Amino acid sequence: MRGLKRININAYQKSMGELIDLSGVVDYNISHHPDAINIPYQRLMLYYDHYLDKNKSYYLTCHKGIHSAKAVTMLEYLGYDVTQAVT
């Protein structure tokens, strides 16, 4: 198994794929990257096939990096093109 794909969030550009902030709604409303959409971690993990397309690239972020690391690991195993975007 490969290592976790990771970039610094400052290197993210919209043309790379969709940036998803996995924070809860309250934390997202307090602070988030201007290009990020919010899909809370638990919701994405339950309904990933509803939100994600295996033919697209995604960059996942959260405030502490724990949820985004877990999500990238699981979703990559399931065949999605996902990268952790860290601060």
Model-derived segments and their meaning:
Residues 21-23, 47, 67:
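Short, cationic motifs built from Arg/Lys/His that form the positively charged side of catalytic pockets
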